[in-house]
Amino acid sequence: MKIHLIRHNTTLEFNNETSLLDHLEKNNIHHEYQCRSGYCGSCRVKIKKGKVSYKEMPLAFIQPDEILLCCCHVESDIEIDL
């Protein structure tokens, strides 16, 4: 799958083997985080296109157009405001 980062103007390949947050860090793209488990909401970003899901609904409140990088499962190519 492809992850397009709007503000970085770059696209990364992604295979769901790690969290999206971990994958971004491995590619030297850093974003704020704290808990890494869906509790705090610090890693929240806007999703513009595509679909994600969660194994368990995160405790952090998110809007329908937001995802948590630490715990989302990418279902399709996505475009995020990052």
Swiss-Prot record:
InterPro entries reported for this sequence: 2Fe-2S_ferredoxin-like_sf, 2Fe-2S_ferredoxin-type, 2Fe2S_fd_BS, Beta-grasp_dom_sf
Alphabetic keyword roster: 2Fe-2S, Electron transport, Iron, Iron-sulfur, Metal-binding, Transport
UniProt-recorded Gene Ontology molecular function terms: 2 iron, 2 sulfur cluster binding; metal ion binding
CDD domains on file: fer2
Named cofactor requirement(s): [2Fe-2S] cluster
Limits of the 2Fe-2S ferredoxin-type domain: 1-82
Entry's cofactor comment: Binds 1 [2Fe-2S] cluster.
Pfam families: Fer2
Binding locations of [2Fe-2S] cluster: 35, 40, 43, 72
NCBIfam families to which the protein is assigned, alphabetical: PRK10713.1
UniProt-recorded name of the protein: Uncharacterized ferredoxin-like protein HI_1309
Organism expressing this protein natively: Haemophilus influenzae (strain ATCC 51907 / DSM 11121 / KW20 / Rd)
Organism taxonomic ancestry: Bacteria, Pseudomonadati, Pseudomonadota, Gammaproteobacteria, Pasteurellales
